[in-house]
Amino acid sequence: SVHGPEGDSTMLKMTPDLRFRPVCHQCQSPAMTVHSQGHHRILRDLNLAQSQVWLDVTYRKIWCTDCDGVRVEHLSFADVSKRVTQRMARYIHDLCKTMTVQDVANHVELNPKTVKAIDKSYLEKDYGQTEGKGLRILAIDEIALRKGHRYMTVVMDYFTGRIIWMGPGRSKETLDAF
C-alpha cells in the first residue's frame, strides 16, 4: 500500500505465470519463442473501497509465427493500447451513459481526455458501422457546437430520424467523407 496525492492507493505487482505459454494478442496463437522479458505497464483498475488500485504488470514480447513478427503477449484483463483494465474501461463507459465526461473523470480521478477516449472506443465498437439497407431518402443537417464556433454534419434516415453518420465541420469535404 502506498500513499498517493489524494489518499491511499494500492499497487499490485503481477508477473507472468511461467507454467503457461504466452499467447499472441493479435491472433491468439500460442508462441513458441519469447522475444524479450521484463517489460512493464502500469494499469489503473477499479477502486477497492476508497483506495485506488494500480497494477504493475510485467509482460513478455513474443515472436509470433502466424503474424510473422514480434508481438506483445495477450493479457486477458487489458487491451494492448489502454492504460486501464478492461473492467475499469467498462465501468467508465457505463458511467458515461448517465454522467458527463467531466463528472466521470472527477469521480474516477482520471484525465477527461482519457475518459472520453475510453467512452468513444466503446461507442465505436457498439455503433461503428451503420447499415445502409432500406434507406430511401437521406436528411442532412448541421449542428453547432460551443455557441456556433464548431459544427458537425449529421446524415439521417428521413423517415425514422436514425442517425446514419456524423462528421466534423460543415463543408463539402466533410460530406465527401460520408
Stretch-by-stretch model annotation:
Residues V72-E73, T85, T114, T153:
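Ser/Thr-centric signal marking residues that sit
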